[in-house]
Amino acid sequence: MKSLPHITLCVSPLSWGYMTTYTFFNHAGGVGKTSATRDFGYELASRGHRVLLVDFDPQGNLTSFLGADKWGLNQDATLLAALLEDDPNAVQSRLPATVEVHGLSLYPATIDLAIAEAQLLAKIGRERRLSNILNHLPQAYDYVLIDSPPSLGTLTVNALVAADSVITPVATRFKAVDGLPGLTRMVNELQWVKPSLGFAAFLPTMYDQRNRHDSDVLEMIREQLAPLAPVLPPVRYRAADHNDASMSGQPVQVYKPGSEAARDMAQVVTAFLELQGQPA
């Protein structure tokens, strides 16, 4: 694995009662990022927290994974419309209505979000457009979780700059770990735009404890990433549970309560809240 560039560690204890925004980010696809965002958010909501999920990926998988019909949404009020609105005071009127599902609020993605990459390039303050949206939310939340695109474009920059800090799912595969220097370098460079940006935690995903390769890579993740941010307990991959939950449009905890996948995410969120000094 290539050496990781230096990056400032910004993991501060959170004040109870304030909205905190985390972006789930990994520029590599296939690491379980969207499922982790959904299930992490549901676990928080099931413990009484007010949670807003933001599907900021033009593919709209988070929207689909929660059972929302992304093709039947109102196309006049969308995340794209809010992003491109030049009057900060008019942003709220351009926002879509949240989809309320499984105790969560969701800002869904529509396919037109894909054109934002090009259109935002000509906009003043393009890196902070999503931040401005979150500053004008019509209601209060404890947590906002952003599912970012698996890319390094303008939308991803917006998702990162809007965050208080970053949660990075990392598959326990050498190929996934080998790409992390580029990811950490990007967050490091964005500190020019947002000096406080840093990693909140790394979340090992796709873990199969029966596989020696996975165990070796998990140990590598713990050794090499722990200096940057805490490494959370791994989420074991159970294809049937995770894939079927997504196909049914449900968090895995709803689709199969008490399953290994559901228990893993409960342990992850408990560990995360304890790290932040919050009641689990």
Residue ranges, per PLM feature:
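P-loop NTP-binding core
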Residues: 1-280
